A protein has these predicted regions:
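Class I SAM-dependent transferase core
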Residues: 1-55, 71, 85-102
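Conserved SAM-binding loop of SAM-dependent methyltransferases across substrates and taxa
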Residues: 61-74
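Flexible, active-site-adjacent loop/turn segments at secondary-structure boundaries
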Residues: 22-23, 31-32, 61, 124-127
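Conserved beta-strand/loop positions that form the S-adenosyl-L-methionine
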Residues: 57-59
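S-adenosylmethionine
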Residues: 72-204
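Residue-level recognition of conserved structural "scaffold" positions that shape functional pockets
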Residues: 30, 65-67, 158
Length: 204
């Protein structure tokens, strides 16, 4: 994990240097950059199979997409982001960190329906699950999976999205809690990271 931790540290340095002036992270976020953003973003990595093609929707500053690309060099990640200044940031990061397993698409997820088919969709802090699902479900191949970072309302969002999950061809979703404690230290904060998971039901 040493090499991966070093890669995360390099990304952290870029965020500290550039994040505020590029409007990516406010100064109040910097003290909790590791716990709230970087390490929290690693929670999705255990749900991505080796060799997968991943779409990270609404990548913004790079959470969780850039983090996933750094800690899982065995997968390819498409960073989907509609805002020009954020797209430029993601292109710069991919260049500065020599991320050859990353490509950046300036688009909304729904603009890529029929053009992009992936094994896994990730995202964080984009929209409520009931709004998000119709945008991202069409990007999945059969048996492809959503792995979405959510907060304390994860279970409630699943309940609210039950009908749209079914209409979008997805199996019932569940919450996977990633234990944040390593050697007694809470890596992600006081609560576990919550990942909402579901998969695309094969189309007959």
């Amino acid at each position: 994990m040493g090499e991966r931790a070093g890669a995360l540290a390099a990304f952290a340095e870029l965020l500290v240097r550039e994040g505020d002036k590029r409007g990516l992270l406010g100064p109040r976020e910097l003290p909790r950059l590791w716990t709230r953003h970087l390490l929290n973003s690693t929670a999705v990595s255990g749900f991505v199979p080796s060799g997968a093609l991943v779409a990270d929707v609404g990548s913004g500053a790079g959470f969780p997409g850039v983090v996933l690309a750094l800690v899982r060099p065995d997968v390819d990640v498409v960073l989907i982001e509609p805002m020009a200044r954020r797209v430029q940031w993601l292109l710069d990061v991919a260049d500065w960190l020599a991320l050859d397993n990353v490509r950046v698409a300036r688009a909304r997820a729904d603009e890529l329906h029929g053009e992009l088919a992936v094994d896994v969709v990730t995202c964080r802090a984009v929209a409520a699950l009931r709004e998000l699902v119709p945008w991202v479900a069409p990007l999945l191949v059969d048996d492809g999976e959503l792995a979405i970072l959510k907060g304390a309302r994860a279970a409630a969002e699943i309940a609210e999205a039950a009908a749209v999950l079914h209409r979008s061809g997805l199996a019932p979703a569940w919450v996977e809690e990633v234990d944040p404690v390593v050697d007694g230290v809470h890596l992600f904060g006081e609560e576990p990271a919550r990942v909402v998971r579901t998969r695309r039901v094969p189309r007959g």
